[in-house]
Amino acid sequence: MAFNKTYIRVGYSCMGMLVGFSAFLVWNIAYKQPWTAAMGGLSGVLALWALVTHIMYIQDYWRTWLKGLKFFMAMGVIFSVLSIVAFISFLCVAISRQQSLTDPTSLYLSCVWSFMSLKWSFLLTLYSHRYRKEFADISILNDF
């Protein structure tokens, strides 16, 4: 029996959520680096939104709530822009302060987590768009 891609996406989103939230806790408690913690937490929240998107797709809730998918797409775009701005800002500040790449409190790790947030916001936008397109086609067919 073939394994459905959606279930792989659910597992991947669960893993991303756990890693993002653990990064939030580690960089807040152990390293006292709030910027890296914030971007790790944002990555975890975006992975959680992607997980919710997949679960609602599996449970067929999106068919009746296409505006919700439009909202998720808008949030994905907004957080993509925010992540790009954060990545560039952290990179510029880390270079200007001549921080070490191996230091766990440097802003280079904030750049990494900004990129991870960008990845999850892009995936949130992509999956919301795909699911919306699929259900929009089905709703057009149901009108006849």
Swiss-Prot record:
Q: Taking the first listed entry, what is the main subcellular location of this protein, grouped into a coarse class?
A: membrane
Motif location (Di-leucine motif)? 140-141
Q: Which GO terms describe its biological process?
A: erythrocyte development; heme transport
Membrane topology per the entry is: Multi-pass membrane protein
Q: Does the keyword Transmembrane apply?
A: yes
Specify whether Transport is a keyword of the entry. Answer: yes
Compartment(s):
Endosome membrane; Lysosome membrane; Cytoplasmic vesicle, Phagosome membrane
What GO annotations for molecular function exist for this entry?
heme binding; heme transmembrane transporter activity
Q: Which cysteines are joined by disulfide bonds?
A: none
Q: Which spans of this chain does the record mark as coiled coil?
A: none
How is this protein annotated for GO cellular component? Answer: endosome membrane; lysosomal membrane; lysosome; phagocytic vesicle membrane; plasma membrane
User: Can you tell me where the transmembrane regions are?
Assistant: 10-30, 38-58, 71-91, 107-127
Q: In which tissues is it expressed?
A: Expressed throughout the embryo, including the central nervous system.
Q: Which reaction does it catalyse?
A: heme b(in) = heme b(out)
Which Pfam families does this entry report, sorted A to Z? Answer: HRG
Q: What happens when the gene is disrupted?
A: Mutant embryos show severe erythropoietic defect.
Q: Which domain of life is it from?
A: Eukaryota
Question: What family is reported?
Answer: Belongs to the HRG family.
General function of this protein: Heme transporter that regulates intracellular heme availability through the endosomal or lysosomal compartment. In macrophages, is the heme transporter for heme-iron recycling. Essential for macrophage iron homeostasis, transports heme from the phagolysosome to the cytoplasm during erythrophagocytosis (EP).
* This protein's name: Heme transporter hrg1-A
Q: Which source organism does the UniProt entry give?
A: Danio rerio
Question: Which lineage?
Answer: Eukaryota, Metazoa, Chordata, Craniata, Vertebrata
**Which gene carries the instructions for this protein?**
slc48a1b
